[in-house]
A protein has these predicted regions:
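A short, surface-exposed loop/turn module that caps and links secondary-structure elements
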Residues: 32-59
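Enriched for short, Lys/Arg-rich terminal
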Residues: 2, 11-24, 49, 57-65, ...
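PIN-domain endoribonuclease scaffold, especially VapC-family toxins
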Residues: 24-32
Length: 87
């Protein structure tokens, strides 16, 4: 599956690369796992509700969540920083 990043999620990814390399390693592990198993696996995957009902969330750590959407052809990453409730 193709990986796609929103403008916000790419900025988040670059921020982790510069300021939180240990968490970036965790993010990369989550991305690999999502490619293998989009709806199960590490990071406690959970479907989101309400206006984000087509998205899923995985725990990076207690503060940050990886939010993504799976389509027939790609995985779209919406954000990596904070909880999805901050959108």
């Amino acid at each position: 599956m193709k990986l796609a990043f929103t403008k916000e999620s790419w900025a988040d990814y670059l921020w982790f690369q510069e300021y939180e390399p240990k968490l970036l390693k965790r993010i990369n592990e989550l991305i690999k796992d999502i490619q293998r198993n989009p709806f199960t696996g590490i990071g406690k995957p959970e479907p989101l509700k309400a206006n984000l009902s087509s998205y899923w969330s995985r725990r990076i750590n207690s503060e940050h969540r990886l939010v993504y959407k799976v389509t027939d052809s790609e995985i779209i990453f919406a954000s990596f920083k904070f909880h999805y409730s901050k959108h």
